């Protein structure tokens, strides 16, 4: 299960999606909808991964697709390890 909370950041002109649980299976499609619906026209999108406990291949592919356009914060050690290839691939460019 994945819980997705939305917090607008009026001062910064962006928004934060806070995730709790597993980014996997059907929840990846739900996350994509939330991301597309909440992505600001102007400003930055931040995704808070503090309470993410698992990311499957579909979840990693989603983060790989959006990573250049978002800031990922508060990664647990587990999530950070799973996302290392995504971050390395984009930071190397």
Residue ranges of predicted features:
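Amphipathic alpha-helical interaction surfaces in cytosolic regulatory modules
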Residues: 19-92
């Amino acid at each position: 299960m994945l819980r997705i909370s939305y917090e607008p950041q009026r001062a910064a002109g962006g928004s934060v999606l806070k995730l709790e649980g597993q980014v996997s299976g059907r929840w990846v499609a739900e996350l994509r909808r939330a991301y597309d619906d909440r992505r600001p026209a102007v400003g930055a999108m931040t995704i808070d991964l503090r309470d993410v406990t698992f990311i499957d291949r579909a979840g990693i592919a989603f983060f790989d697709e959006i990573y250049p356009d978002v800031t990922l914060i508060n990664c647990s050690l587990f999530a950070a390890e799973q996302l290392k290839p995504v971050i390395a691939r984009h930071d190397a460019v």
